[in-house]
Each structure stands twice: as C-alpha cells, then as structure tokens.
Amino acid sequence: MFGKGGMGNLMKQAQQMQDKMAKVQEEIARMEVTGEAGAGLVKVTMTGSHSVRKVDIDPSLLEDDKEMLEDLIAAACNDAARRVEENQKDKMAEVTGGMQLPPGMKMPF
C-alpha cells in the first residue's frame, strides 16, 4: 500500500503540518482586527480569540439615540467577528495548502 518509507514520510508530513498549525494558531490568537459600523463612527477591536479589546465611539453619537448607538456597537462587534473568521480561514488555508475540508469541519480538529 505504501512504498518504501511511505508511511514514515506520511507521518513526518503530518507532524510538520501539526507544527505549522500550532504556530498559526498562536499567530491568530495574537492578531487584532477592527470592525466598523456607521461609516466608522463605531469601531470595535477584537483579538483572534474573539475577545473585545477596545470600543471606540465617535463623540457625535453620544448625543444621539441610545438604541441607534447600541445597534451600531452590535454591528461593529459582528463585523469584527466576521473579520476574525476570515483571517483564521486565510491563515489555515496557508497551512493546509488550500485543502478543502468537509462542511462544518473546522481546524484544528
């Protein structure tokens, strides 16, 4: 089934991929992205592990409707989370060489 050294090479490749994935996971956890809403009036900075680091609200919004401000904050958080997911997907694609995973399966396993 496997040629000479085939199984050993396969195991070596798997270990290398696992090492690369560990490095990428560390990089993802350290990265920060900023989501925006209201044309940049509300900005949310989030880490790769989805922790909100900072919320920046333009002072002009503090005079407006509380409900609108709450909606903008939620939208900015959702935008930041979407950006984190996109970055994670891109970083993992670098490691897997674009290998497609079955729907619903996330890396790491």
Curated annotation (Swiss-Prot):
GO terms for molecular function: DNA binding. It is found in: Cytoplasm, Nucleoid. Signal peptide: none annotated. Transmembrane segments: none annotated. GO terms for cellular component: bacterial nucleoid; cytosol. Keywords: Cytoplasm, DNA-binding. Residues 88-109 are annotated as: Disordered. It comes from the Bacteria. NCBIfam families: DNA_YbaB_EbfC (TIGR00103). Homodimer. Belongs to the YbaB/EbfC family. Binds to DNA and alters its conformation. May be involved in regulation of gene expression, nucleoid organization and DNA protection. HAMAP family: DNA_YbaB_EbfC. This is Nucleoid-associated protein Swoo_1794. It comes from Shewanella woodyi (strain ATCC 51908 / MS32).
